[in-house]
Amino acid sequence: MLTLSPAVRIYLATGATDLRRSIDGLSALVRDRFSLDPLSGHLFLFRNRRGDRLKILAWDRSGFWVLYKRLEQGTFAWPPEPPGAPVEMSNADLLLLLSGVEIAQTRRRRWYERVA
C-alpha cells in the first residue's frame, strides 16, 4: 500500500505510453511533453496501449523510483481524455485506480468532522 504526503501531487498521463521507456525516457516525457519537473517529488503515472500495465515515476531526493504493475486480468480504468496534458488526481483516486475501481463510476459522499 502506498502512503503519500498530502503535498505530493499525482499526474496521470492520458493516452498510451510506450512502457519500454524506463527512468530516463519517462522523465524526459514528463519534462518535454508535460512541461513539469520530474525532480519535483510528485508521482507520474503511465499506462500501456492494452491498458493492463502501469508505471509510476517518482523522485525521493536521492534518486528515481519506477513502480510497475501488470494485471493478470482486465485493464486499468483510465480517463478517456485524448493524449495531451496530464490529469491530476487525488491520493484516494490513485488507490482506487490501483485496486481496479473505475473512478468515473464512484460517487463521493460528504464527510463532516465535528469541530468542537
PLM regions with names:
Residues 1-116:
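Polybasic/polar functional segments that serve as interface/processing modules
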